[in-house]
Amino acid sequence: MNEALKNILERNSHRNLVEPIPSKDEMEKVFQAALRAPDHAWLRPSSFIQISGDGLQKLSDIFVDFAEENFDDLTEERIEKYRNAPFRAPLIVVLVSTKKDHPKVPEMEQIISTGTAGQNIMLALSALGYGAIWRTGSFAFNNKISEKFGLNENQTIIGY
């Protein structure tokens, strides 16, 4: 069977992610693969924020701050869940879709392009022997979280 097809057919989401993380050179290849996603009019709506090491604690703080500011009836158990969420993986890639004005390419198509870039990231990591999982939930498609990342109004986090 063709190796590319085999990789697609055998890829699974991995809930328990552990070190080692991909090297800088491997991540360059992963991001090159991501940018080969379909992209009508070559708008390049996709960008990526790579988080590891001390950045995981910063992401944890963002999640907890957001939860405390926005969720009613927040239990200590739920706060702990949000606090620990970034530490389920030693490396997190935040998928950001940037809306660009174009007469023939609506925003949804640009978001889909970033989604396919995310799939390419997952396939590239799988081909390199790493596990991956796409997560969304309350912290994706969320303007308040995007603000905490310093993103602009036209930028949306579509997954982690």
Predicted regions and their residues:
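Structural motif
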Residues: 90-92, 131, 156-158
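Conserved hydrophobic/aromatic beta-strand scaffold that supports enzyme active sites
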Residues: 7, 92-94, 160
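Small-aliphatic-rich amphipathic alpha-helix that forms the alpha element of a beta-alpha
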Residues: 34, 93, 99, 103-147
